[in-house]
Amino acid sequence: MDAALGPPDAMAASEGDLTPMMSQYFELTRRYDDALVLFQVGDFYELFCAAAETAARICEVTLTAREDSTGQYPMAGVPIDTAEPYIEALLDAGYRVAVADQVQDPDEVSGVVDRAVTRVVTPGTVTEDELLGGADNNFVAALAGGRDADAGFGLALLDVSTGDCYATRLGDEARVRDELGRFTPAELVVGPGVDADRFADEAFVAAYDDDAFEPAAARERVADYFGGEDVLPTTAELRACGALLSYAEYTRGGAGDSQRLTYLNHVTRYSPTEHLQMDAVALRSLELFEQRSVHGTDGTALVDVLDETACALGRRKLTDWLRRPLVDSDAIAARHDAVGELVADPLSREELHEHLRDVYDIERLVSRVSRGRANARDLRALADTLAVVPEVRGLLADADARKLQSLREALDDLPEIRGLLDRAIVADPPQELTDGGVIRDGYDERLDDLRATERAGKQWVDDLEASERERTGVDSLKVGQNSVHGYYIEVTKANMDAVPEDYQRRQTLKNAERYVTPELKEREEEIVRAEQRAQDLEYELFVGIRERVAEAAERMQAVARALAAVDALASFAAVAAAHDYTKPVMGGDGIHIEGGRHPVVERTESGFVPNDTTLNDDRRVAVITGPNMSGKSTYMRQVAVIVVLAQAGCFVPAAAAELRVVDRVFTRVGASDDIAGGRSTFMVEMTELASILRAATDESLVLLDEVGRGTATTDGLAIARAVTEHIHDAVGATTLFATHHHELTADADRLPDALNLHFAATRGDDGVAFEHAVRAGAATASYGVEVARTAGVPEPVVDRARELLDAPATADGGDGGTTPTADANGQRGAAAGIVAELRDVSVAELTPIEALNVLNDLASRVD
């Protein structure tokens, strides 16, 4: 962010000479010195000095200058009506934006108009639809560091646009990163003791008032919102949640009660262990929410193929269920039963879908209502949504699944609120309240009387044209009205002789004169007075209606949650029915999948080959070999995705599946480096591997792909073997390990709870043909040269590779080979010594870290 966004030093020195308006501007820039202040001047938001230069550059608007008695200021401005895209550009550039609106009517004030910051827009607290960019949650998070070594971290998350609020305590920085990867907040507010730079890659990081993180202040704020000091039992959670609430209030501008988020009444305290845990690496590798691989999935993520939801509420709920799959068997079974019932009743499911399409995003509507920013169309959308609720409840009337029964009971259509809105708000209200015509006739007698007066006056004016034509004999006489001169009678200059004496000239045109009469002026005053009073009364009535609706915010949020769950379950059922998914059996001693398929790849590639999987307590570690492109990575991801789907409550793409509940899914799949962090592919791989080996349990699912390939072959093989043995002997996790180290297949044969699987291929005249079918046993060939040829490597290179592959003996100086140099012989001698030492190492007794240390020591002795 620019170092100075307020007045330059020279200007600050002579601030007493500033005009009142510029003094007001600079006072706001001092108060909101961490933001760009958009300062309303008439129909524009304007910025001055360094802030203007910054905004002009980012928003690509013209930089001009404002001149007054104190000098010239650089100035940039954007129209208020089209400000949102410019605000979005400033947010994307890393700025907060403080919006300072005029809070007085300029026509009613002598002197400078008062202005106040009405909202501070930040990446994590935007609520405008134009800035949110979709139905997904937009979280702001707060992170509080523990006051001592054992306190850990407190993490709180809030979606200001919906009211979703979560809090948890996390033991260390790694767990913090896992949760940030799971929720992907747009903004992270950090407290004292937290190194903001360490989380700069996770979100837009914002430092905030240290006092907001103080336990006493945080405890008071949490109790004020959520009704008790024991809602969050640990100090770390309290500090994070209290500071987050304070920050959310700060972004609302104003002061006191005007800042309060009245619709926020519930915080969900959770432990990560209550759900299937997946860190950011696993979420990316499995492509749950964003597609990042290049194996033909056409940019499609898992959430995309599952999303048959009818409304925004359902889309967010489905995303949340994938983000946080269940680990409680009863809860999983409840979702499966509900999905099964909807699969079996396609007519009801389709009717549900049709009704749910008429459901608006009432979570965000309730948020706008409670913040006093909802317009008449928002209230009409609420009423229309509440009208759908009885229809949805009726379709669930005969449901047997207990999940559907509980959702049916939660579907409250709030008859008093719906009735109020139907009586009060017209069916198709205008966008702006100032346009009038928002409140129905018959709702308020006073408004009806004013409208009657207005209509009668306008009817008199309409009749006036006919009567004056008859009176004057001028057929071309017209009665009109404009915003400057009001009502008038227009007579062409050719008919000036027919103008009566009581006409009073109001305006002269080139070919006509415009007049008024005393009676027309009197009627005009009556009409204008009635219009203004009606407009004021209509606004007053609307605000009262909006406040009454806001009082029911908690009930409407409960309805929103129920509708969201129904929509997500119906989406799961629609996908299951359309694509032949099966209800998994949860329990047993492992993962048994018959005819499993990858739900994304089968939809984006033709000829997908289903595969079976059997892993249990007797066969927990599968070593998978086979050529590149044969399907190893897809197969491993497929198994993990099926587990995730099952625990999210969805049916799975398979002929049959019996699955144990897993606590975590870990992945080390694909090569990646961290250029910005200065970490090589191998270092990133080892860091991810270390995290897996520390955190995995015997209830976890682990996917490993090509461990150790970022270093020398001997080192990589040793690491891969050590990891395999450690997982088998010490961790006990269900593991799929794809490798090109064929030496690992001997370990799989040797280890009692391991097995070999392979993907076969056949050579032909046109190259290698992949079967994409998993088979028992180890692969007998890697087909690397054939894959290179298939990929288009030039034929001379492929031919030379075959020669080298077929003649390995030449490297030893045999017939036809070159004689080894003295250096080469010396290296062989050193290598022989290292090999001898390796033979003496008891790999089974080493921890992974000890194994890495041994390798590091040996590697350091190799020139």
Swiss-Prot record:
InterPro entries in the cross-refs: DNA_mismatch_repair_MutS, DNA_mismatch_repair_MutS-lik_N, DNA_mismatch_repair_MutS/MSH, DNA_mismatch_repair_MutS_C, DNA_mismatch_repair_MutS_clamp, DNA_mismatch_repair_MutS_core, DNA_mismatch_repair_MutS_N, DNA_mismatch_repair_MutS_sf
Functional summary from the UniProt entry: This protein is involved in the repair of mismatches in DNA. It is possible that it carries out the mismatch recognition step. This protein has a weak ATPase activity.
GO MF annotations, alphabetized: ATP binding; ATP-dependent DNA damage sensor activity; damaged DNA binding; double-stranded DNA binding; mismatched DNA binding
Positions in coiled-coil regions: none
Organism: Halobacterium salinarum (strain ATCC 700922 / JCM 11081 / NRC-1)
Descriptive protein name: DNA mismatch repair protein MutS 2
A GO biological process held by the record: mismatch repair
Keywords recorded for this protein, A-Z: ATP-binding, DNA damage, DNA repair, DNA-binding, Nucleotide-binding
Stated family: Belongs to the DNA mismatch repair MutS family.
CDD domains: ABC_MutS1
Pfam families per UniProt: MutS_I, MutS_II, MutS_III, MutS_IV, MutS_V
Source organism phylogeny: Archaea, Methanobacteriati, Methanobacteriota, Stenosarchaea group, Halobacteria
Amino acids binding ATP: 626-633
